[in-house]
Design a protein with these regions (language model features):
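The catalytic core of metal-dependent phosphodiesterases that act on cyclic dinucleotides
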Residues: 96-187
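Bacterial c-di-GMP phosphodiesterase EAL domain
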Residues: 1-97
Length: 187
């Protein structure tokens, strides 16, 4: 159930260039395999517990990966609480310290704002150890409210949907929001 998805840079008319792989658990695949008629996200607290458990499995899997395919340039979707856990400390101890700067930890915006103090602690610790922080779960209409520099995130990740093109066309300040966030720091 652990999947990979490439994050690429598109510069001008050049072909996309892979920057890193996102490592994640497909909740849809998990649901289809275990409980096809159940919405795993319906109960936020139960879903949080599920994702915290999945985070720990992903950390264990990545830190024990011995085929060399995850030796740099990858990201993981994690909960803020996972970064503050013993399992993350174990993960941190098990990886080569030189790899940390090529690992991006993606944190959901809703998780960040549910406990901003925990986020600040987790972010500060992770960045001190050398990891990059990506603020994930931002929709086009919320971008204007997010200040990447104030949150001290290294990257912003926008959830994309084709209908967002209408919002972009209607919002004359959208380019300003993108420029404020810095294009090169957006996914």
């Amino acid at each position: 159930l652990i999947r990979r998805q490439s994050v690429c840079a598109v510069i001008g008319k050049s072909p996309p260039q892979m920057i890193f792989d996102e490592v994640f658990v497909s909740i849809a695949d998990l649901r289809d395999m275990l409980l096809p008629d159940v919405d795993l996200t319906a109960n936020p607290w139960l879903f949080l517990h599920l994702t915290e458990t999945l985070d720990k499995r992903v950390l264990a899997s990545v830190s024990q990966h011995d085929d060399g395919s995850l030796n740099s340039n990858f990201s993981m979707n994690l909960n803020v609480s996972t970064i503050l856990s013993d399992e993350f400390l174990t993960f941190d101890e098990n990886i080569n310290p030189s790899m940390r700067s090529s690992i991006v930890l993606e944190l959901q915006l809703v998780d960040i704002f549910s406990d901003i103090k925990a986020f600040i602690l987790a972010k500060t610790f992770a960045q001190y150890r050398g990891y990059k922080i990506c603020i994930d779960g931002i929709t086009v209409d919320k971008l204007k409210y997010i200040d990447r520099e104030q949150l001290n995130g290294d990257l912003l990740k926008i959830i994309w949907h084709p209908s967002f093109m209408d919002m972009i066309r209607e919002d004359s300040h959208f380019t300003d929001y993108v420029n404020r966030a810095e294009r090169a720091k957006m996914i």
